[in-house]
């Protein structure tokens, strides 16, 4: 080696080290997320946009459901009051509700001062003689009820009961039971609280801090026997991040230990072990950096998927360290690098389609795979030859592994017909059985069933069970959204009267549009007119008109009052409810994005659900109104997700075929390379189907990995068939050992992934571990011919020390 060449090689290693240091630093600066919004479409429908806004930044994403269980009624109520007080004073929450009236006084006063602008009963008829008489009679009838205690002090100022009607309009259709002054469950011994976290739903650190604060405050005040329950979107997101992080760490640790053990057994050298790990480290770092820079954040599932590079990227290091022993670095680059390069290109062709997916999560997986594999291959090509010019410095059990592989190569072709028949039978089975591709968006989430059950229980207790259907109304401005919500409300009132709906909640019930408030204000008569009508309406009744001067004064004051605006409710409990129903454009949305009003619907008791077609017909003509069926929309998102992934996987497969055809330039060779890959995919699919596994997007990604890994094996065996010499002489022990070692590391790493508690990661492992093993065995059976014996009839040697034929 010349001095100039040596300097160039040292410089290459120096550049690699600098790049790895930069990548490691960038990884520490990357943002890691765990919410499912990364797996939602980038070009959603209007209905899907509503759901996505709630998942990302909506008020729904900031809701924290709190339960206090154990103890007796008094203990739970006291704990609820003390916890609510502590949380309100912490500054971490916009609002905390537990059924107490604390904080309602200011809001109530503001509403009372504009009750005639807000009450749905106020119109021109309300202040006629007949309207006044009916209103007063209704109010007097309530004096003997439990509500009379609150009505009586207001009687002379509000004889028509607009305060009562306003309260009825603003209360949700269903509400939790109140006991000892706080909300409680109807079914279990539990006090209930609802908090709105100040941190954005996408701010998982802020959400985690708020949850930790709740736990700390509860621990400080809880009496004996009391336990805390937390749920809500933020709880799920924080727990999912922790689960994914824990699984990634566990899998990375277990995978590293397994790889270390396998490589030490194979190489018998710590130095070789360290060298084999370099492509893996480069691949993982490059993948994280590429996704972080390209997507702005790295999803936890993408990071978990990155641990699979341990299984594939280490193959490159093994190929070089083992195969370079008899050839040296220059010989390895000449003989074996073209095959490794072609295998890399086929992998990139398969994953390139994913990188252009309309789903950010799927695009992340594609980008991570491409970047990681390229970095691992380039590290093998340019760095390992400098650090280990003669390959692995150790021997270990490589020769025994190579001998065992050689024996397998002789025996497997005898099973070719049986394996072909098995593959055909598997294909027929897949054609006859119902499609196993039935995954759901929830299948990507690591939230356990127990946590989902607790969430459903808390929501049911609060009277906020998950709505199956809602109405979303888009409008260019907040005012227009309220006006359209009022129009929709008038249509829904008809359905309530017909028994089609039990009720609905609308932002316009809490904050009527300015136009509606001004119309009600215009219906208020002047003092003289009102006094005359009151005298007639109260004649012969229990309320003398002479005592209703406060009522007349209030009406006159409100004739001059400005309409109530959203800003007037800031800091009150009503603000949180309004924020959940009247949504501004998303912060990341383009200019001109619409406001959205959400109207939740309650189906009549005992019914299976709402008739969406009838709802759409009723709302026909209300601009921007859409009926959103939540579960069908989620199913549609995932179905589109899966359908797009299938098309992209198909395009990737076509790209692989085209690349191989261009390189091999032989239909026969192309067929024998593709046959074991196709058979491995079919057998894996049939096996998972027979086991009752519901297949989803991540299984599809796993199949791409099977093709990516298996193509290396198929191409190697294809080169054994290039000429007669390959048929008469078995490949050398080191080459065979490198194949077996690469396969073992892949199967072990993906086998560990199959044990993950995160379903999405487990899906990849369940697919690739058996698929990689099958790809090796089927390649050996379908491609490797039986070695021809010498003419004297003696059998050929199983293994030899001469290198295999170079690829062309």
Language-model segments: residues:
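Signature of alpha-helical transmembrane segments and their immediate interfacial
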Residues: 1-34, 385-440
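Transmembrane alpha-helices and their membrane-interface boundaries in multi-pass membrane transporters
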Residues: 293, 309-325, 341-356, 360-399, ...
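Pore- and gate-forming transmembrane helices of large, multi-pass membrane proteins
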Residues: 277, 327-357, 725-756
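Alpha-helical transmembrane helix bundles of large polytopic membrane transport and channel proteins
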Residues: 25, 81-191, 499-581
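Juxtamembrane segments of multi-pass membrane proteins
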Residues: 416-540
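Hydrophobic transmembrane alpha-helices and their membrane-interface caps
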Residues: 272-319, 670-716
């Amino acid at each position: 080696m010349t001095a100039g060449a040596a300097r160039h090689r040292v410089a290459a290693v120096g550049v690699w080290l600098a790049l790895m240091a930069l990548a490691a630093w960038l990884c520490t600066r990357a943002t890691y997320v765990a919410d499912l919004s990364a797996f939602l479409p980038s070009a959603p429908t209007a209905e899907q946009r509503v759901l996505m806004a709630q998942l990302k930044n909506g008020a729904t994403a900031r809701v924290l459901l709190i339960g206090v269980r154990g103890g007796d009624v008094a203990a739970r109520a006291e704990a609820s009051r003390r916890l609510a007080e502590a949380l309100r004073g912490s500054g971490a929450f916009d609002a905390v509700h537990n059924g107490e009236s604390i904080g309602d006084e200011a809001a109530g006063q503001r509403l009372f001062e504009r009750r005639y602008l807000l009450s749905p009963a106020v119109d021109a008829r309300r202040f006629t003689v007949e309207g006044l008489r009916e209103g007063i009679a209704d109010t007097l009838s309530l004096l003997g009820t439990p509500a009379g205690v609150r009505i009586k002090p207001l009687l002379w100022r509000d004889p028509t009961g607009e305060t009562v009607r306003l309260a009825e309009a603003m209360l949700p259709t269903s509400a939790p039971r109140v006991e000892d002054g706080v909300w409680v469950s109807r079914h279990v011994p539990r006090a209930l609280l609802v908090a709105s976290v100040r941190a954005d739903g996408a701010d998982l650190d802020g959400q985690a801090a708020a949850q930790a604060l709740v736990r700390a405050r509860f621990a400080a005040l809880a009496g004996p026997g009391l336990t805390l329950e937390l749920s809500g979107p933020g709880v799920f997101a924080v727990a999912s991040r922790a689960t994914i992080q824990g699984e990634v760490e566990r899998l990375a640790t277990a995978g590293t230990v397994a790889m270390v053990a396998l490589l030490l057994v194979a190489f018998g050298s710590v130095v070789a072990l360290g060298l084999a790990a370099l492509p893996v480290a480069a691949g993982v770092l490059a993948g994280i950096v590429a996704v972080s820079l390209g997507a702005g954040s790295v999803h936890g599932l993408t990071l978990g998927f990155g641990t699979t590079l341990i299984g594939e990227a280490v193959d490159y290091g093994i190929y070089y360290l083992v195969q370079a022993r008899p050839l040296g670095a220059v010989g390895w680059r000449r003989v074996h690098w073209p095959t490794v390069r072609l295998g890399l290109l086929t992998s990139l062709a398969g994953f390139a389609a994913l990188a252009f997916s309309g789903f950010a999560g799927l695009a992340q997986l594609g980008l991570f795979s491409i970047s990681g594999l390229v970095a691992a291959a380039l590290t093998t090509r340019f760095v390992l030859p400098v650090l280990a010019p003669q390959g692995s410095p150790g021997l270990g059990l490589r020769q025994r592994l190579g001998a065992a592989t050689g024996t397998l190569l002789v025996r497997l072709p005898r099973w070719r017909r049986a394996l072909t028949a098995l593959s055909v039978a598997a294909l027929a089975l897949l054609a006859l059985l119902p499609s196993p591709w039935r995954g759901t968006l929830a299948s990507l989430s690591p939230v356990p069933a127990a946590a989902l059950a607790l969430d459903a229980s808390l929501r049911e207790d609060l009277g906020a069970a998950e709505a199956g259907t809602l109405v979303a109304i888009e409008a260019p401005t907040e005012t227009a959204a309220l006006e359209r919500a009022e129009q929709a409300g008038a249509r829904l009132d008809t359905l309530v009267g017909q028994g089609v709906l039990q009720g609905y909640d609308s932002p316009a019930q809490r904050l009527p549009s300015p136009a509606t408030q001004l119309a009600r204000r215009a219906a208020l008569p002047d003092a003289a007119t009102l006094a005359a009508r009151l005298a007639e309406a109260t004649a012969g009744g229990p309320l003398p008109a002479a005592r209703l001067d406060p009522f007349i004064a209030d009406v006159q004051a409100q004739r001059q009052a400005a309409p109530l605006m959203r800003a007037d409710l800031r800091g009150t409990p009503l603000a949180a409810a309004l924020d959940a129903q009247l949504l501004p454009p998303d912060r990341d949305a383009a200019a001109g994005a619409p406001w959205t009003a959400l109207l939740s619907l309650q189906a009549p008791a005992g019914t299976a659900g709402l008739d969406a077609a009838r709802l759409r017909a009723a709302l026909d003509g209300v601009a921007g109104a859409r009926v959103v069926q939540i579960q069908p929309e989620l199913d549609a998102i995932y179905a589109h997700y899966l359908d797009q992934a299938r098309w992209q996987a198909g395009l990737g497969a076509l790209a692989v075929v085209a690349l191989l055809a261009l390189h091999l330039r032989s239909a026969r060779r192309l067929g024998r390379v593709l046959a074991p890959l196709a058979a491995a995919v079919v057998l894996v699919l049939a096996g998972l189907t027979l086991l009752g596994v519901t297949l989803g997007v991540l299984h599809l990604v796993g199949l791409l990995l099977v093709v990516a890994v298996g193509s290396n094996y198929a191409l190697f065996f294809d080169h054994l068939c290039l000429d007669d010499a390959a048929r008469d002489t078995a490949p050398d022990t080191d080459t065979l050992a490198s194949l077996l070692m690469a396969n073992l590391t892949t199967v072990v790493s993906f086998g560990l992934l199959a044990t993950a508690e995160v379903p999405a990661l487990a899906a990849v492992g369940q697919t690739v571990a058996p698929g990689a093993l099958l790809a090796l065995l089927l390649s050996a059976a379908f491609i490797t011919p039986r070695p021809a014996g010498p003419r004297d009839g003696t059998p050929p040697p199983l293994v030899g020390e001469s290198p295999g034929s170079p690829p062309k």
